[in-house]
């Protein structure tokens, strides 16, 4: 009976992922994955979250089958912030959809970082004003930086603003990305065309009363049901999510406000639904597995042709 030699399973580490994964292809891939999901062409359970006893942490499994098939195993350890370890760590196992064979194991930290910001950029590309004067980043961590990079791929702006709960780190981040730091959150948000909320705040940091009509807000920082970044007034706007089921089950912004969800992002991208003219849009993201699966498959497909002595269409060998 043949079986796979798992010792030969390719491992694609973060450095290699970084060399292969570029923003524009990833933004396009993420948009297509969300369209595929909303069209009903993805089999995916709601993310399975397991609290880690005695730790300020969770462990999660995120499988999905769409055009590609993979599963992400991820941990979120909040107390790693400020240490040598990242708060998010994970791996993604890409599988052959035709025969179930493992194809490669990929580092999941950078893919998670980039696909999250790519989702925001895809929404901003579709819904943000064509002419953008002000972009505000709320936060100073990994997602704050990723959002600066991703949003720069889809819009040019005149002013970049930063607000953060930690003033020292916020100022350092603002200096690094060429932004103006604001001590006052309201002042930072007023008149902004795009606002990216990327914090781990459990209580609202953004109030709807501050928002410019027609602004696009991307909220990605707190993705479990026991915390929220946006208040009820903010969530009373036109709310877009990746998945109705995932948002209702795991979004603190949605659950805490009991808001109406207007559409899934994939429905907007495919033209099934249209945002009303002049609407203020809230993209509330919890992250869904098909985004990781699509990003990982993109990396794998870019990596495979570069391997010496292996044809891009060659199957992995089984050992007898």
Task: List each language-model region with its residue ranges.
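N-terminal ligand-binding/catalytic initiation module
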Residues: 1-113, 121, 131, 290-293, ...
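Adenosine-phosphate binding glycine-rich loop
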Residues: 16-18, 224-320
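Short helix-loop-beta connector
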Residues: 127-134, 156, 212-213
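Glycine-rich Rossmann-fold phosphate-binding loop(s) that bind the pyrophosphate
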Residues: 140-141
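N-terminal Rossmann-fold NAD(P) dinucleotide-binding loop
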Residues: 144-145
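NAD(P)-binding Rossmann-fold cofactor-contacting core
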Residues: 153-176
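Rossmann-like adenosine-cofactor binding region
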Residues: 179-256
